[in-house]
């Protein structure tokens, strides 16, 4: 196994604007890291720099304790799996998986051994003589992964490999990728815009925004303790409810637009007089009643999801989304009374967006 290290790596196309801000990342031997973020955030560019397909403007890349910053892709000990499979249509599954080893001059016996082992792991044994056009999307993606496995790389690089698959097949392939990593234990760097893939596959998630790593942490950490307003809004479905306002001068209240107020706790009071953003996840609201007090949510729409429901409504000028038990189905125009437990409230700096 081998580790991967990015040391203050940056990228600029014109020498002025940095599309990747200096970024440092240590990936342990056998670790599975997922880079997630919206389109244009720089995640694929960063992956291509690790692969050697893009030049690094500054900084260094280390694989298996070797500096590979200027090395050709073929010499880095990496194998890449792409979104579009990149299979040769005129070759069989077996030939596609073996081709990279063949052009490297590996012996036929060893090639056959590696292809058979990869086919066994990926359950492609009975498909080795077929052409790509005879395979389903999931089978083609397994062939692409098999072609990477036979190389026995130090690091796997995945560039949105499940994007072309339908929803049901994506779920199946996520499970297969988890099982594959548990079996091979190869260091992996995976790019996706899909937060479900990120949260289910990763041992650690790197959330990227405009070329910056906003947060690096376990899936639980980035969900339960987002490092910034951006992470809070990007990770989670639905996104965290974010309310703009300020802490009162005496620190005792959170003052929102429209004259709405919420109590603060002792920790919040150190931010007295400052603009802040308050966040709460949809599942952390507690149903209350008018007699018990709380905040009134005027219902707009209800999304019935099966296991639970999402209530969309307004509290004054604030729009909120609340997750409800499946049997709770308020109608449009009705009022829900809610309690916001202080222990589940998140505070973000109103200027920087960073967690307070």
Positions of predicted regions on the chain:
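The feature captures the beta-strand-to-loop junction immediately N-terminal to the Walker
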Residues: 36-38
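Conserved coupling/switch loops of ABC nucleotide-binding domains, chiefly the family-specific signature
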Residues: 57-60, 110, 210, 345
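Conserved ABC transporter NBD signature motif
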Residues: 59-67
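Helix-to-loop junction immediately C-terminal to a conserved catalytic motif
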Residues: 51
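Non-catalytic connector elements of ABC transporters
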Residues: 238-241, 249-356
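ABC ATPase nucleotide-binding domains
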Residues: 73-230
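ABC ATPase nucleotide-binding domain
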Residues: 5, 26, 62, 337-339
């Amino acid at each position: 196994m081998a580790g991967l290290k990015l040391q203050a790596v940056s990228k600029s196309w014109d020498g002025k604007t940095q599309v990747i801000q200096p970024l440092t990342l240590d990936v342990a031997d056998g670790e599975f890291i997922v880079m997630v973020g919206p389109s244009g955030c720089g995640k694929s560019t960063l992956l291509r720099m690790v692969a050697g397909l893009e030049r690094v403007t500054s900084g260094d890349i280390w694989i298996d304790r070797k500096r590979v910053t200027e090395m050709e892709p073929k010499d880095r000990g990496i194998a890449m799996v792409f979104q579009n499979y990149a299979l040769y249509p005129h070759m069989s599954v077996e030939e596609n998986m073996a081709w990279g080893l063949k052009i490297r001059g590996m012996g036929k016996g060893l090639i056959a051994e590696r292809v058979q082992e990869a086919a066994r792991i990926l359950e492609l044994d009975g498909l080795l003589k077929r052409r790509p056009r005879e395979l389903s999307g999931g089978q083609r993606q397994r062939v692409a992964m098999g072609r990477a496995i036979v190389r026995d790389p130090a690091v796997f690089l995945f560039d949105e490999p499940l994007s072309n698959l339908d929803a049901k097949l994506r779920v199946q392939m996520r499970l297969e990728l988890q099982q594959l990593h548990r079996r091979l234990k190869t260091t992996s760097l995976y790019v996706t815009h899909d937060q479900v893939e990120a949260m289910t596959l990763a041992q650690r998630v790197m959330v990227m925004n405009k070329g910056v790593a906003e947060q690096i942490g376990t899936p639980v950490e980035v969900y339960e303790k987002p490092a910034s307003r951006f992470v809070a809004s990007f990770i989670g479905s639905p996104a965290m409810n974010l309310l703009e306002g300020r802490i009162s001068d005496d620190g005792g209240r959170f003052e929102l637009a429209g004259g709405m107020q919420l109590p603060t706790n002792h920790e919040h009071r150190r931010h007295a007089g400052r603009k802040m953003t308050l966040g709460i996840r949809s599942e952390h609201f507690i149903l209350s009643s008018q007699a018990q007090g709380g905040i009134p949510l005027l219902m707009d729409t209800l999304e019935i999801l099966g296991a639970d429901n999402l209530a969309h409504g307004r509290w004054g000028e604030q729009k909120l989304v609340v997750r409800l038990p499946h049997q709770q189905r308020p109608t449009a125009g009705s009022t829900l009374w809610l309690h916001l437990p202080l222990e589940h409230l998140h505070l973000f700096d109103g200027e920087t967006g960073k967690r307070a």
